């Protein structure tokens, strides 16, 4: 039975590799493998398509590899260490998804792109430093990395993508660089361990559910650059007692009255004294009129 399972897994991996090379998700019968392999398009052989031995505990990616393909190491649940060479510039979607035992990874300075769900479900990861040349972090890139306690986001990033760090329950603090202009929906949703968030001075949009269920947050400062706050952006942050808008020159748009639902009963929203009346009367803000207080800088 074990031998049959091993053969089945092997054939599945071969099919996955062929489909990745072709860029086609159409199922491939095992009987067609010889024809499919012969007809594979020529191209860049520096792309690591798939790890055939899914039971490997360690792997060193060959020097000269420039891209780690989509799902290359997905579900390699026993993989504990990986060496990525300095030639790699791109980590594909789901490349290391659900590598539960992977405890650390060093992303080389050569990498510029981290694909969607690249490290999703890597519950053993405790810290990640994203290199300064990375300009794109995909959707759900680090989703459900529950063991992650620290993350360094470089200044090269301009947007925190949807669910990028969703359910990273071990994260205690995060600093969003000044070049970031948007925090997309559910970016830090359910990061229950977060106690400190620093939002950069270029952020204009805080998306839907961006910090929902961040139950460890007690206070947060929203920079004056923010013009829009989405649905349930801070909903169910049950210990949130202070939100500071004191550097704002205008009232930001609140997408819905639920933006701060189920926060602390003692929540105080600090705004510039000169804008208190306007703030209390603004659409959707009026729901929180009794929590809005004016402060002088």
Report the location of each language-model feature.
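Structural signature of tandem-repeat unit edges
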Residues: 52-67, 77-90, 100-113, 123-136, ...
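Structural alpha-beta junctions
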Residues: 17, 21-24, 285-296
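Short, surface-exposed loop and linker segments with low hydrophobicity and enrichment for Pro/Ser/Thr
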Residues: 40-42, 73, 237, 257-267
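Short, aromatic/basic amphipathic alpha-helical patches
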Residues: 256-260, 277-289
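Consensus positions within tandem repeat domains that build extended binding/scaffold surfaces
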Residues: 70-74, 92-97, 115-120, 138-143, ...
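Surface-exposed receptor/substrate recognition regions of extracellular proteins
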Residues: 1-62, 66-67
